Amino acid sequence: MLTSFGEEIEQTPLQLAALMSAIANGGTLYYLQYPANQEEARNFVPRVKRRLDIAGLIPVIEPGMRAAVESGTARRAADDGDIAGKTGTCTENHAHLGWFGSFNETGKRKLVVVVLLTGGRPSIGPVAAGVAGEVYRRLNDTNYFADATPRHGAPALISSQICCQR
């Protein structure tokens, strides 16, 4: 059984994405940067903030994250590719927040997807995993992960509403 419980840990979705990226890449933490326009996106250069000493922990963490997607609370994110992720749910002032942080481990393109949902039931984290799974599935359908050629601009799916019924 995989379980975890956290209270009083505050982070933004971008901070969670940076942490997921560090786990996926072996421990390099990058500065959070958000290109404001297409020109900045074309000229984007990642900046290293620091190296996290987590190399010895990754072989323990990743299998649990994969198991969460394969057979745990994040199974709605399951796709043909190898996805590792972690769900979470928290309550603040009687409002429920559900989140899912993930990364893919197959193909030539690597991607971190973080979804934060508000409202709903106390078990909204698995719903967030379903939304992320739909992102991975739609990108997979366009062969996004098979091609390493640089692409500029956000994929069309980002501007469309994603609804997941799984």
Per-region residue spans from a language model:
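Active-site beta-strand/loop architecture of penicillin-binding DD-peptidases
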Residues: 1-49, 56-59, 65-146
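Short, highly charged C-terminal tails/helix-capping segments
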Residues: 146-166
